[in-house]
């Protein structure tokens, strides 16, 4: 009986050891990817913040009617959701999906969705939520190529009045253990009051450059979301894999203890049987 128990525990020890090797390797890979993602995030964040300042000045000094500021009359809302292509990253994806569901549940008829990432597409399909477009297999370091494709699609949907508001839903990265889901409205722009002592002259007139300015701003904004999303994904995966490795270590300690106790019990029983047999021979 003890022998069968020892064999079962030995199998479990082997299984947990193999799992620990996988989680440890994935944790190391995620750590390396996170380091690269954080460098990319810092670079993109500087560019994005500077472009926001420039755009703010441009928007505030546009006096002519413009659909990108005044709206286009459509009541449809577009949500662009940033999720991951791979799993095993804790609650990273489900937190984003839950926030989207809470946003659209009050007005499903006027809510449209573009999803980025295999996992987001899978969750939305299970929930019966249709998507306007899907973008998958985004590289670990996203480029302007991916951002431009999405930006052009957003501009097309907005300028054709298929959507009247555009929101980006992504995970803002603060640290490997802290990320926050944000819902950022990017269209139409919010115009602020002009400063009385500030005057900017644009040449050529800014209205002639509006389409180019809009596309560049959307590219910068989408790249910023990509960078935050990739850093958050890898931070969540690193934390999840490190936690899984720690749990595997604890489980192995318990299994080793059970194995040693069972083996000791088997040895004690065997010695008792030998002694008992010897006594019977007398």
Curated annotation (Swiss-Prot):
Where in the cell is the protein located? Cell membrane
UniProt GO BP: proton motive force-driven plasma membrane ATP synthesis
Q: Which organism is it from?
A: Clostridium botulinum (strain Kyoto / Type A2)
Q: How does it sit in the membrane?
A: Peripheral membrane protein
Please state what the protein is called: ATP synthase gamma chain
Any single Gene Ontology cellular-component annotation = plasma membrane
Query: What is the similarity comment for this entry?
Result: Belongs to the ATPase gamma chain family.
Function according to Swiss-Prot or TrEMBL: Produces ATP from ADP in the presence of a proton gradient across the membrane. The gamma chain is believed to be important in regulating ATPase activity and the flow of protons through the CF(0) complex.
InterPro entries tied to this protein: ATP_synth_F1_ATPase_gsu (IPR035968), ATP_synth_F1_gsu (IPR000131), ATP_synth_F1_gsu_CS (IPR023632)
